[in-house]
Amino acid sequence: MAVCIIDHDNIRGVIYFEPVHGKDKVLGSVIGLKSGTYSLIIHRYGDISQGCDSIGSPEIFIGNIFVNRYGVAYVYLDTDVNISTIIGKALSISKNDQRLACGVIGISYINEKIIHFLTINENGV
């Protein structure tokens, strides 16, 4: 299993790459974006020393996520990505080819756990 922590300005989230019932899934949640559709993209390098400017070229389009009116996206996507090949690379959240936030994909400790999704109610809490 792999995990990517996103924490850039007000954009925060946790994205997991893991096998679920024999298929690889991308699971997690992101908060802090404006309502709309965004892309999850794996990039060549896991170098975030200069923010999302140093992560290299896009390599793999994972899929689109939808951010609701409260600024929350719940991620549940199928993927054909071999998880072992993306460790150490970067994942970006992008819109119209602009990288808005990114993080490095790392190995996650494998244990039985429940994925806790970031939630927000109608009052923004």
Swiss-Prot record:
Annotated compartments: Virion; Host cytoplasm
SUPFAM superfamilies in UniProt: Cu,Zn superoxide dismutase-like
Domain of life: Viruses
Entry annotated with the keyword Hydrolase: no
Major localization class: virion
One GO cellular component, as annotated: host cell cytoplasm
Record InterPro entries: SOD-like_Cu/Zn_dom_sf (IPR036423)
An example Gene Ontology biological process: superoxide metabolic process
Cysteines engaged in disulfide bonds, as pairs: C52-C102
UniProt similarity note: Belongs to the Cu-Zn superoxide dismutase family.
Role summary: Superoxide dismutase-like protein with no enzymatic activity.
Official protein name in the record: Cu-Zn superoxide dismutase-like protein OPG175
Organism field: Vaccinia virus (strain Western Reserve)
